[in-house]
C-alpha cells in the first residue's frame, strides 16, 4: 500500500491523504481489497516503465545514426555530446531492464538486444574518412536496424504480457519518438549525395511519415481525461509540421542551414514526444487500468 501511495504521490503530485483516498475509492469501485488495488498499481507502474525504456531503445537506435551523420556533415554543434548522451542512455536502459525483467521470460530477447548493441558500439565510436563515409553510414544504419528490430520484439512481448489495457496506447505513443527520429535520419542521409542512399531515404521518409501521422490521428481520437496529454498531442502535431517543413529546401539556403534546421526541428519534436510518453506512462488510466 505504501509503495502504491508513493507512486500516486510522485506521478500525480498528490498528498499522502489524497493518494490514500484514491486507493480506497478504487478498492470500493472494483470490489477488491486495498492490498490488491495497491499491487495492481505497483505492477502497472513497473510494466509501464519497462515498456517506456524498451521504447527508448527503439528511438535511440535511430537517433544514433542521425547524430553520427550530423557530426560528419557539421563539424561544430552539440551533436558529439548528444551522441555520447544517447550511448549512455542505451547502456543505462539495458542495465535497468536486465534487473527489472524476468530472465526466464525475457532473457533471450534482452540478450539479443544486448548482443546487437555490443556489435553496434564500435561503429558509433568510429569516425569514417570522407571516401568511406557513405558506406560507413550505411553499415551503421544496418546495425541500428537490427537494434530497432530487437527492441520492437522485446517491447511487443512486454505489451502482450501486461495486464494493463492502456499499455498499448503507451507503446504507440512511445513509438512516435522512434518514428520522428527515423524520419529525421532518412532526411539527413538523403543529404549525403549518394543516389542509392537517396532513393532508400525517400522510401524511408514516406513510410515513417505515414506511420507517424496515422498514430497521431489515432491518439488524437482517443477520449482524454488529462489536459497535459491533450496539450502535448497538440504540441507534437505542431512539432511534426515544423520537422516536415525543415526537409524542404528553401530557395538560396545552403546545405549547412538546412542541416541545422533539420537538427533543431528534430530536437524540439523529440522533447515534446518524450514528455507525451511520460504523461501517458504516469496517467491514472495507466496506473489503475481504468
Residues covered by each model-derived region:
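Hydrophobic alpha-helical segments
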Residues: 1-290
Amino acid at each position: 500500500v505504501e509503495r502504491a501511495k508513493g507512486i500516486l504521490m510522485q506521478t500525480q503530485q498528490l498528498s499522502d491523504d489524497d493518494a490514500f483516498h484514491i486507493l480506497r475509492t478504487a478498492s470500493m469501485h472494483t470490489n477488491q481489497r486495498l492490498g490488491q488495488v495497491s499491487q495492481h498499481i505497483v505492477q502497472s507502474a513497473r510494466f509501464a516503465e519497462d515498456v517506456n525504456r524498451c521504447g527508448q531503445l527503439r528511438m535511440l537506435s535511430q537517433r544514433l545514426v542521425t547524430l553520427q551523420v550530423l557530426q560528419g556533415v557539421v563539424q561544430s554543434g552539440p551533436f558529439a555530446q548528444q551522441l555520447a548522451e544517447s550511448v549512455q542512455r542505451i547502456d543505462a536502459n539495458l542495465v535497468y531492464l536486465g534487473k527489472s525483467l524476468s530472465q526466464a521470460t525475457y532473457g533471450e530477447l534482452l540478450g539479443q538486444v544486448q548482443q546487437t548493441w555490443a556489435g553496434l558500439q564500435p561503429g558509433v565510436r568510429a569516425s569514417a574518412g570522407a571516401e568511406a563515409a557513405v558506406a560507413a553510414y550505411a553499415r551503421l544504419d544496418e546495425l541500428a536496424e537490427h537494434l530497432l528490430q530487437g527492441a520492437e520484439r522485446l517491447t511487443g512481448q512486454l505489451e502482450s504480457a501486461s495486464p494493463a489495457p492502456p499499455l498499448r496506447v503507451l507503446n504507440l505513443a512511445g513509438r512516435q519518438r522512434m518514428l520522428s527520429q527515423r524520419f529525421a535520419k532518412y532526411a539527413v542521409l538523403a543529404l549525403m549525395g549518394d543516389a542509392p542512399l537517396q532513393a532508400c531515404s525517400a522510401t524511408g521518409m514516406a513510410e515513417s511519415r505515414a506511420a507517424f501521422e496515422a498514430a497521431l490521428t489515432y491518439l488524437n481520437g482517443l477520449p482524454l481525461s488529462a489536459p497535459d496529454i491533450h496539450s502535448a498531442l497538440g504540441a507534437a502535431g505542431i512539432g511534426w509540421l515544423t520537422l516536415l517543413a525543415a526537409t524542404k529546401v528553401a530557395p538560396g539556403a545552403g546545405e549547412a542551414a538546412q542541416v541545422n534546421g533539420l537538427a533543431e526541428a528534430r530536437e524540439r519534436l523529440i522533447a515534446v514526444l518524450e514528455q507525451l510518453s511520460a504523461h501517458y506512462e504516469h496517467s491514472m488510466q495507466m496506473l489503475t487500468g481504468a
